[in-house]
Amino acid sequence: MASLFHLRFLKPLSCLQAGLLYSLIFGVLYHFPLFVYVYKESNQVSFIAMMVVVLFCVNGALFLALGLISASLMRWSAIVFSLLNSVAFYFISAYKVFLNKSMMGNVLNTNTHEVLGFLSVKLFVFIVVFGVLPGYVIYKIPLKNSSKKAPFLAILALVFIFIASALANTKNWLWFDKHAKFIGGLILPFAYSVNAFRVSALKFFAPTIKPLPLFSPNHSHSFVVLVIGESARKHNYALYGYQKPTTPRLSKRLADNELTLFNATSCATYTTASLECILDSSFKNNAYENLPTYLTKAGIKVFWYSANDGEKNVKVTSYLKNYELIQKCPNCEAIAPYDESLLYNLPDLLKEHSNENVLLILHLAGSHGPNYDNKVPLNFRVFKPYCSSADLSSCSKESLINAYDNTIFYNDYLLDKIISMLENAKQPALMIYLSDHGESLGEEAFYLHGIPKSIAPKEQYEIPFIVYANEPFKEKHSIIQTQTPINQNVIFHSVLGVFLDFKNPSVVYRPSLDLLKHKKE
């Protein structure tokens, strides 16, 4: 193998030649999804030609600029980018994602367990074919010492070509401006490198979180359970008309008029942004503290139990991960890996805090892909056959949907169990369940979530929103019945309204965003 490379590249390449060759390799190997997107959206071959010029110029300028510093730096950067590009290329191809700022925020917030869930043979093949092999070729191409003048002039020439090409296509600027963030999310390595830097910079320079004006809570001794689901889409809930019996327990409760359903959409198609929206006050459209922190400061007991990630800047009475909760539970090994572990302490909380105002937030693992079957105990995998592969495109449509529907079936059991505990509670108790966002299961060749909402299919943002109140709660509050679509931003004010003393209400509270009517005694 080595001898073949030495024969082919008998003469060492100059920095200029190598930089342009690397640019050509990158343009050919990793940008088929970009060309498909551009042609699909424009139906113009000339637009693809424009993108070829752009790719050659930007990648060429990148490598030549690195070459001005050091030929070795240029080579090793190309090798590293080859490996990173292969992973990015896999996810773009397999899940139809755009590596924009929001998606890179998701990537940087991904934990080890979620990363392991994406491992597959297909990913390994992509890394070998599009990462290791090109990297090896680049490594074996000999480089020679050469003048810095030629690469510098070439960079100027590439910049000139880029500008000239842009000026020649002024009539198409509006189209490119409209699609810029999607095109940018497909140009490698800039998509992930630039956007990862943007996300990191935003975190570093994040504005200081401001305190909200304090309020005096009432003495209703209410217990609110806010259940935040993961990747649950409304379409697959029998409650909302889905043909398969995915929610038998909740459907019975709905028939008995125990539940209220809302037509809701998520603020975003990824967890971090949706969580911020759910917990945000929208007060003066600025960076103010979120709901759990605000209520905790007011003296309300706030507990956050999580089987998920994405939470940040949360100050509560107690924050526990599911594995921490389960350590206190004897003989709970069977439920330890699953969302049911979050419910272990709920009966104790109801008893111990019966004379206090309490908010319990349960952040579920829910229907998080791609390994849907791992979110469900064996006895809840009722829809068969079900897909158990991380490579969702390799699964049949039936098995993929069955795997997902099993997560909804299990979620039905969890919510019913919560309701059973609350309906027997002495204090006023309310449960609100909503998902952070939806999920794609192969519709329009999309999988998972995270597509920018402006172009995302409805499956990624139409979510279930379910409310239950026990009898003591109904004596003091009523749930508004409406068919008007709502957003996740109603949560802050609906929960705050439960705890407000309306004789001295908070200036933050917005009644128009409250799903409840309160008896203002």
Curated annotation (Swiss-Prot):
GO terms for molecular function: phosphotransferase activity, for other substituted phosphate groups; phosphotransferase activity, phosphate group as acceptor. GO terms for biological process: lipid A biosynthetic process; lipopolysaccharide core region biosynthetic process. Its EC number is 2.7.-.-. GO terms for cellular component: plasma membrane. The chain crosses the membrane at residues 18-38, 47-67, 79-99, 118-138, 150-170, 182-202. InterPro entries: Alkaline_phosphatase_core_sf (IPR017850), EptA-like_N (IPR012549), PEA_transferase (IPR040423), Sulfatase_N (IPR000917). Keywords: Cell inner membrane, Cell membrane, Lipid A biosynthesis, Lipid biosynthesis, Lipid metabolism, Lipopolysaccharide biosynthesis, Membrane, Transferase, Transmembrane, Transmembrane helix. Belongs to the phosphoethanolamine transferase family. EptA subfamily. This is Phosphoethanolamine transferase EptA. It comes from Helicobacter pylori (strain ATCC 700392 / 26695) (Campylobacter pylori).
